[in-house]
């Protein structure tokens, strides 16, 4: 595979993971709305949880690129969306049980815990893909100074 072809594929994968992350945020707002309303607190909770767990996912992905051998990066990259889909499925099963119980708590605590339940693990695994993609791009171009930028 040529370097340009692999670069286009990697950029498309990064674009798709970003789109899925944005979709999860919007879906979380619609799921939380019946329990906590559509308020500034809900959006604050969703955006705060998103930023925290994106940062943790980037850290986790960078750590995985250092700990896992380079030849296993592709299989690791393929396993991350599967893990994310599994946790999205589990949060779909958990939210009808957890969110009604949280609706009796304060708006701030309930919205943050609800956002955590819905978003934490899928965001970690989706955002961990970006450092691994950058590592794979560096491997395909045989240049240690390429990757994140254009």
Residue map of PLM features:
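Alpha-helical transmembrane segments of multi-pass membrane proteins
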Residues: 1-150
